[in-house]
Amino acid sequence: MNFKETVLLLGMSMVVPVTSIAQDKVEASVGADLVSGYIWRGQDLGGVSIQPSLSVAYKGFSLGAWGSAGIESADTKELDLTLGYSTGGFSISVTDYWFNGGPGYFHYGTHHTSHVFEAQIGYDFGPLAVNWYTNFAGADGVNKDGDRAYSSYISLAAPFKLAGLDWTAEIGATPWANDFYNVSADPECSGSDGFAVCDISLGASKEIKITDSFSVPAFAKVTVNPRTEGAYFVFGLSF
């Protein structure tokens, strides 16, 4: 996610934790998404991008890396590291987001860093998943008084099946004033003065059969941001 306007589309398992059952053996996964646009929490973070992921998990604990690199040289490069734990429907995690274009990777100064540190807690009830995210350190935004905003985001996501596709309807909001989310070129629509709904989305996924033994997962997602008045439609393939 771009720390100013981060938007991941449907393929970002780093940002929306999924329920997992504790296993007695180490499990690992590697993959990548190719997306037509990088949209994260109602924010436009870039155009066509490749987004690789790598993770290991053991007995409910997980450590993962996720990145994004746009095909345009001007697009921000991103590297996210997430340490999490889940049991049943409950999940908790800490993510370190880093973006190029600013201070180098090993700069962790309070006021001189390109890292953003975020804590997440959530519960997946099955028909509805609820997740809360708060920035607690790094290059967070500020509130109307110029103080650290502890910028936060809450999302409600409901999965369902329809016409042979797997769907997810989601709504997300920022609960208080900050300038971290909802960045817009229009100053009247940029930032949040208080509670603001910033992501209303509907996504669907299916597997596209290539051969009798090989298929490629595909997904599409429509997102609107009432705060910035932005609207996006993204398509992606997972490998």
Regions found by a protein language model. Name each.
Residues L202, I208, T228-F239:
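Outer-membrane beta-barrel "beta-signal"
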Residues A22-E27, F160-A169, S205-A218:
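Short loop/turn motifs that connect adjacent beta-strands in outer-membrane beta-barrel proteins
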Residues Q23-A57:
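Outer-membrane beta-barrel initiation region
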Residues D24-V26, G46-I50, D75-L79, T113-F117, ...:
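Residues that define the transmembrane beta-barrel architecture of outer-membrane proteins
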Residues M1-E27:
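Cleavable N-terminal export/targeting peptides
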Residues T110-P187:
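Detector for outer-membrane/organellar transmembrane beta-barrel domains
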Residues V30-Y38, G60-I71, S91-G104, L128-G138, ...:
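Transmembrane beta-strand segments that form the barrel wall of outer-membrane beta-barrel proteins
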Residues G42-G47, A74-D80, P103-T110, A139-D147, ...:
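Outer-membrane beta-barrel translocator domains and adjoining extracellular loop/strand segments
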